[in-house]
Amino acid sequence: MSNKEKGANVERELYQIFIDNNWRAVRVAGSGMMENTACDLIAGKKGKKFCIEVKSSKKPYKYISKKQIEEFIIFSQIIGLKPILAVRFNREGWFFIKPEKLEDPGKNFSISLEQARKKGKRFSQAFS
């Protein structure tokens, strides 16, 4: 399975979690493939609207380019949504973290499983 297919699968998984919890969500067409599509999902519920960048990792950490995060934040601001990263670590489930809480070790931003446990939230905490 290609990285593109894996990414689409985790996006669909998260989309379904939103639907199962009475939120409305849409996957952004061309996410990760085209310019100006700097997020993967848009989700909302009365008075709450989020722009979501979806990441997954088999390893206990994930690196994300600074350019991608900067574009994601700008995109979120332009359309008036709160930016949040959704990171799924295999066998650990989903963590939701604000972009400003990412670690900045240099070239890329990073989030480790340990940091996600400390700084991130689970679905019910992030979207209550």
Region locations from a protein language model:
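Short, charged, amphipathic alpha-helix that recurs within catalytic cores of restriction-modification
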Residues: 49, 57-88
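Amphipathic alpha-helical interface surfaces
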Residues: 14, 37, 68-71
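Active-site metal-binding core of divalent-cation-utilizing nuclease and nuclease-like domains
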Residues: 21-46
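Conserved catalytic cores of phosphodiester-cleaving nucleases, focusing on short active-site segments
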Residues: 18, 41-58
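Acidic-basic catalytic patches of nuclease active cores, encompassing PD-(D/E)XK
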Residues: 1-30
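Acidic-residue sensor for enzyme active/binding pockets
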Residues: 11, 53, 68
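Domain-level recognition of nuclease-like catalytic cores that cleave nucleotide substrates
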Residues: 5, 9, 82-128
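Residues at secondary-structure transition points
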Residues: 5, 9, 36, 63-66
